[in-house]
A protein has these predicted regions:
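Active-site neighborhood of phospho(di)ester-bond hydrolases with catalytic His/Asp-centered motifs
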Residues: 1, 18-30, 48-50, 134-139, ...
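Short acidic/His/Gly/Ser-rich catalytic and metal-binding motifs that mark active-site loops
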Residues: 32, 104-106, 164-169
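Long, hydrophobic, well-ordered secondary-structure blocks that form the structural core
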Residues: 37-77
């Protein structure tokens, strides 16, 4: 994916990268193992994450410790108090971490007893255009403060993991409900679709889609329901301009 996208791999030199810093929203395996592929960077990575994520990444899933045997990292603690911050080289962009109610990974001491900072979404604002995007990859409950960010965004990238709560267990891939894993399904009353259809302003895009989800079939009835509600399904190479 990096090699196929020139802004992230401009190839100006050997082992080049267009990545200036890295933001981590949680310590889940599939959200963080990509750091290992970036271990040969020519200097320590500047990584932005909450304290609880940092603790997971240095204990139960110690990727940061492993990176320390290469170039290492510079950790920048992210507040859970919804305080906007900026990142050097990310010109005209303001980031705000927003605590989400979801689930901590199995190796976290907060499993089934989460604390603010185990999972965050992001408001990402372009100060030149005045527009903003809200990103929420793991969302178990849509709390009031999260709904306000959704309502006021120009683009929403939101958890689209499953269509039904029991989808993965019915498919035989595991014995858990999506809600037990910190994901709100799309089709139930009060689920992701109901939430998105109540929003008038933003462009609505589903992300973090599990391979059991029938919306991946463009000809499925479920996909037709999304289309009729102007809800998009993300895809590799998708380019979003705000």
């Amino acid at each position: 994916q990096l090699e196929s996208f020139p802004p992230l791999q401009p190839a100006r030199k050997i082992r080049d990268t267009g990545i200036a810093s890295i933001i981590i929203t949680d310590s889940q395996i599939d959200h963080t193992t990509g750091l290992l592929s970036l271990r040969e960077h020519d200097k320590p990575w500047d990584i932005y994450c909450t304290k609880s994520v940092y603790e997971d990444m240095t204990t139960g899933f110690p990727i940061f410790n492993i990176l320390g045997h290469f170039r290492g990292i510079n950790w920048h603690e992210v507040s859970t108090d919804q305080i906007p911050y900026t990142i050097p080289k990310a010109d005209n962009i303001i980031f705000t971490a927003v605590p989400l109610q979801s689930e901590a990974p199995p190796y976290s001491p907060h499993r089934h007893n989460t604390v603010p900072g185990d999972n965050v979404g992001y408001k990402i604002e372009d100060t030149k255009t005045g527009k903003n995007l809200f990103y929420a990859p793991g969302l178990g409950v849509i709390e009031d403060h999260v709904y306000e960010y959704l309502k006021n965004a120009d683009v929403v990238l939101i958890d689209g993991t499953v269509w039904t709560d029991d989808e993965m267990s019915r498919s035989g891939v595991n014995d858990k409900l999506a809600s037990e894993m910190g994901h709100l399904d799309q089709s139930s009353k009060g689920g992701i679709i109901d939430t998105l259809t109540s929003l008038e302003k933003p462009r609505k895009i589903l992300i973090h889609i599990n391979n059991t989800n029938p919306i991946l079939n463009e000809d499925s009835d479920e996909r037709k329901i999304l289309n009729s509600n102007n809800i998009e399904v993300s895809y590799d190479g998708m380019d979003i301009i705000i």
